[in-house]
Design a protein with these regions (language model features):
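Membrane-embedded alpha-helical bundles of multi-pass transporters/translocases
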Residues: 84-99, 105-109, 136-156, 160-218, ...
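Short helix-loop-helix connector
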Residues: 114, 224-228
Length: 308
């Protein structure tokens, strides 16, 4: 062990995170001129929580080796495994920022489209307005899961490609980005004055749902296998935070768009604000997928499935 008072860098990092989180909440309460007006309590509180978790995680990682000899090695290794999984979770938050907007941004886009009642295969008795397209997601999930398990994954294995959990999750993030590119192309057509059928939205829904199956279901299995028995409940709790922080990315982006300088820049691109944001979120997903792939190549897999 280090001498008393030495090697406490992790404590300083964690303390800095706590102080910064408190400072952010105080800044929101006082409302100085330099604090963004669009950062209300929800955004500020989520940012403060993110800073607290990030700095706490880094600080804990730096201090873990000091705990050996005081705490059992298994306990120390369990905490380190949780910290590694949290990085994986953090890299999936951009996916949720895209996925959750299907119930808002995509519905708004769909309301500008024409409902194709004239198509013989269109279920007019089920889909009478854009919001009802949401029912396509759970229906596709029930089809895609058995397709992946019975057809896609065995086919990949026969080709010598093992669809590991991390590979599936990274691919799922990419598919979410592709879905938003398709949605952006549809938005360009709408902005150009074309009459676009709501049926075209089936493609981004299909791509996004395929990504959801690869990310969401796989991540739960992955986290369960990586966490030790004592930490499985903890890791599940952190998983539910990924959706929260995914929504935070959307809040921050929308707050940034309301800035005059950003609005002026969007105008120079020739795109509408909606189209610009769709392509922005697609790029955000691709950047996250690259970061995910880089980390996944270095991730030391564990096997902590329950045997009884």
């Amino acid at each position: 062990l280090s001498k008393q008072g030495e090697g406490r860098t992790g404590l300083y990092v964690a303390a800095f995170g706590g102080a910064l989180a408190v400072f952010m909440l105080m800044a929101w309460a006082v409302g100085p001129s330099w604090w963004p007006e669009d950062f209300g309590f929800v955004i500020t509180a989520c940012l403060a929580l993110g800073v607290l978790i990030a700095c706490g995680g880094v600080g804990t990682s730096l201090q873990l080796e000091r705990a050996r000899g005081i705490h059992p090695d298994d306990t120390v290794d369990s905490v380190r495994a949780v910290l590694r999984v949290l990085i994986v979770f953090a890299l999936t938050t951009p996916f949720w920022s895209l996925f959750d907007q299907k119930a808002s941004t995509w519905v708004i886009q769909g309301r500008a489209m024409a409902i194709p009642h004239e198509l013989w295969w269109w279920p007019s008795f089920l889909v009478k307005e854009a919001g009802q397209m949401q029912a396509l997601n759970p229906a596709l999930v029930m089809l895609i899961i058995p397709f992946n398990n019975l057809v896609l994954y065995p086919a990949l294995r026969r080709m010598g490609v093992e669809p590991t959990a991390l590979r599936r999750m990274g691919t799922g993030i990419v598919f979410a980005g592709i879905a938003w590119i398709v949605a952006g192309v549809l938005q360009l057509a709408l902005d150009g004055g074309a009459q676009v059928s709501l049926a075209w939205q089936m493609w981004p829904y299909l791509l996004l749902t395929f990504g959801e199956v690869l990310v969401s279901a796989t991540a739960l299995e992955f986290a369960y296998s990586q966490a030790t028995q004592a930490m499985k409940g903890v890791i599940m709790a952190f998983w539910y935070l990924t959706s929260t922080f995914g929504s935070l990315w959307v809040l921050l982006t929308n707050a940034g768009v309301r800035n005059d300088a950003v609005t002026a820049h969007i105008a120079t691109t020739g795109l509408s604000e909606n189209a610009f944001l769709m392509f922005f979120f697609a790029a955000f997903a691709f950047a996250a997928a690259l970061g995910f792939a880089w980390y996944a190549r270095r991730y030391p897999m564990q096997d902590n499935y329950r045997t009884a």
